[in-house]
């Protein structure tokens, strides 16, 4: 007979999925009515006005799933829920009024500080091959705040093609769910699955050709959710490789952001300057269709996620080897697609010199 908790989780998953499937068309009409729409531009791939704010449907689905699962009684859920509500309101206002980056950052900072004030933080750091552990002390507070704010924005940075951010979030959250299941962490498993179900329900309307965009309402909420779930998994103890796992789960947006910064520095552009050279843009410029570009990035995200799962139980040397291979893998993709520019190919140049010597 199935455990009662597992039955609740399955019911919560179904409730979240059905809620979003039903509510998304309503959210779409509301977005159009209030003018929360995305205008076409030369930096964007869509050529018509699109309703934003789809993240509101995801949020409503998550709330429905949480209520169905009964996990709202958990002690840490109050602060997490308040933070999620603030992030959703922030996203809705941004989708409608295009808030400044400074305003968004300050509000996210406030949410992160509120979460940390409840005691949910990383208290010490340990390295597997050293016996001594390093107490973070007062540094636990800024590091945890940085973690929450950084990951909250990570999904927003990759939200450039139909279904891309939603699909990558599902892949990342599924990885967290698998790890939570293997570790017997019911709260993380339950939250992960209701967010997955809600995002899948939204993806039905968001995959190419999209009928609605998630907007900052969705990307910020999904980023916030992943930051909290990964933090719950790291709670108190942070090891060298445990902190790498959520970074690998978010490998695609982190990789894309890192190379965007390198690109803008080398091209002498402001770091915050928008451009059309993100990985999804480069894949399309490479000749891939909109849908195929998304699927290729899904595959990359899947590779990262499988690597994260293997890392969880790998030896130190295998962990280092996997991380090294992932770095080389992403560097090759960056050079092949011209992610920085056509001249930035250090690995290719090194390989050619090596071949000539032999």
UniProtKB/Swiss-Prot annotation:
Instruction: Spell out the InterPro entries in the cross-references.
Output: Glycosyl_transferase_4 (IPR000715), PNAcMuramoyl-5peptid_Trfase_CS (IPR018480)
Residues annotated as site: Could be required for catalysis: 159, 162
Q: Which cofactor does it need?
A: Mg(2+); Mn(2+)
* Alphabetic keyword roster: Cell membrane, Cell wall biogenesis/degradation, Glycosyltransferase, Magnesium, Manganese, Membrane, Teichoic acid biosynthesis, Transferase, Transmembrane, Transmembrane helix
Record's keyword annotation contains Transmembrane = yes
Record GO terms (molecular function):
glycosyltransferase activity; magnesium ion binding; manganese ion binding; phosphotransferase activity, for other substituted phosphate groups; UDP-N-acetylglucosamine-undecaprenyl-phosphate N-acetylglucosaminephosphotransferase activity
**Which Pfam families does the entry link to?**
Glycos_transf_4 (PF00953)
Record-annotated membrane-spanning stretches: 10-32, 53-72, 76-93, 105-127, 137-157, 164-181, 186-205, 218-235, 240-262, 292-311, 316-338
Q: How does it sit in the membrane?
A: Multi-pass membrane protein
Pathway given for this chain reads:
Cell wall biogenesis; poly(glucopyranosyl N-acetylgalactosamine 1-phosphate) teichoic acid biosynthesis; Cell wall biogenesis; poly(glycerol phosphate) teichoic acid biosynthesis
Q: Name one GO biological process term.
A: teichoic acid biosynthetic process
CDD domains for the chain: GT_WecA_like
Instruction: Name the site position(s) for Important in orienting the substrate.
Output: 94-95
Family classification: Belongs to the glycosyltransferase 4 family.
- Per its database record, what is this protein's job? Catalyzes the formation of undecaprenyl-PP-N-acetylglucosamine. Involved in the synthesis of anionic cell-wall polymers as it mediates the initiation of the linkage unit formation that appears to be common to the two types of teichoic acids attached to the peptidoglycan of B.subtilis; may also be involved in teichuronic acid biosynthesis.
Q: What is this protein called?
A: Probable undecaprenyl-phosphate N-acetylglucosaminyl 1-phosphate transferase
Which organism is this entry from?
Bacillus subtilis (strain 168)
